[in-house]
């Protein structure tokens, strides 16, 4: 795999499996080619190979001719979430410390609302806690105890372990999770339990079971979250092995022998068969976020809102100072809080497939969060769908051309879309069909714009300081409505498959976390009292583990860069801030000061300088080692300006309805692929691309820059609103 890190161009395939479409990006001989296929939920490997076939068609190669030329495949998938939602996992047994058998059943107070939609949270009185993934009779305690310092308080009773293990096996357990108190401080007991399981049920026994140790999955504090992370990994391990194994077998049968990497929600990629299931959740949106950060840096945009409008959801995240700074430390997967640090993206149930309906009162229109998916899909797909969606509204409004949708490979039935909107929306509300379609579009745009406003304002930023990267199949179609106060929106030629394109520039990244609580700055005195030896020993242990894993994957250790991130907080506060340490080791008070200053700067940006609390001291909670092995990245193309006239891309005119004027208009239509750098189009206009449509409303202007990107801006921008300081906004 070391060949992937050299500076020579590599050929790659990047695939992102979404709820509605499977996106494909092929980088071959330095050029990019994109394709899109419907997702096949019953067997994701079918959609995977369909996408590869569609990509091969772009370069005139069959799958068997294309795959042997590929060096690397990167994959982001929803397979883990699909299996979890369908509860397709084995019966799991849990061995935990005696007296703590009910910890994951009790959960945390927030578990009543974890994973619930806003409407469900408002009606919490009728909500039930989620059914556990492990039955109560398959959770047994063993006699042992390690304290918070890692010292053995009660030795492990090995005979008790053997007895409890046999009980679990007799009750039908087909996978074992071992999660003991404070095992991340001292994993000796967990390791010995695994040895006992292997002694009792050897690899060649029919009763052999996989074993997941919590300290191996998450070496961090948090009993409930650490245990649930291990449980999810054990629950999904076998089904993911089968699904991904089936895809791998098909790839090898068709001649592929390169690297197969999985996109991680931590912002990198790693060997697919060495990836914990919990690291695959939300991989697609994270790839889009990383792609946004990369292109923001290359194009000179400091602050970017990454907005991904797919068929099922709208994912939004921020790039600040050309980098990703926001993480979620205890994300909720389905209904369970886990202890996996993910790059933070916010998801709302708004997308091209979002279903519109009139509520029970008959007076209010709702759009989302339910989605029609790819099967049966929107009504206009003519595949049996009966409920109108956002895509149906876009077709009725005249924005999407039914004859050229999906590159002309999926003709749309406009008449059925009109009928569904008329009968299900317009008639119940007592309005015209076209008004109903415009209302559907308005509501979904406002839902997405509100998500952006919340994310920007709640972090103390000003929308006018940002640029919107609009991507996903429906992103360019709706960007004018969702950008709000953001002055500029950018559309990439690969916008419909941007998450897959984002993964094409992702490095190989391994992350290692270790909880070690230390006093960094003494309360009251503001003196640095961090234990240098303990600090450096923790870092060195993680570095050595990283080097061993890099060698085992065939990667050159000399190619890797090591970065340290620290989870720190002020005394008397509860909010941890993950900061990038300027140093790997601390050897002097001057080193400690440099680390603290970096923490104070990032803390102030995140929470406001008004809540910096040096007298309360500073505490270090967790170490994170980020190991990056860079991969080759294709250059961003640059074209000479060709003038403002877009007539070479003109396709003709077609009627479209514009709510801004409340009239139909013969609207100029252009072909995106034929536009040249420097071309300018004033709205109203429609720009068709192979896999998406750019809508340019009245009083908006679309221009093509020197990189072939489409830039949407207001012709007469509104005067800027009165600003409040970022600090004040953060407090509000």
Swiss-Prot record:
Q: Which UniProt keywords apply?
A: ATP-binding, Cytoplasm, Ligase, Nucleotide-binding
Q: Is Ligase there in the keyword field?
A: yes
Description of how activity is regulated: Inhibited by zinc ions, carbamoylphosphate and beta,gamma-imido-ATP.
Highest taxon of the lineage: Bacteria
Q: Where in the cell is it found?
A: Cytoplasm
**Main location, first listed in the record:** cytoplasm
Q: GO biological process annotations for this chain's record?
A: glutathione metabolic process
Its GO CC terms are: cytosol
Any Pfam family hit = Hydantoinase_A
> GO molecular function terms here?
5-oxoprolinase (ATP-hydrolyzing) activity; ATP binding; ligase activity
Reported function: Catalyzes the carboxylation of acetophenone to form 3-oxo-3-phenylpropanoate (benzoylacetate) in the anaerobic catabolism of ethylbenzene. Also carboxylates propiophenone at the same rate and 4-acetyl-pyridine at lower rates.
Quote the NCBIfam families the UniProt record gives.
Answer: AcphenoCarb_ApcC
Q: What is this protein called?
A: Acetophenone carboxylase gamma subunit
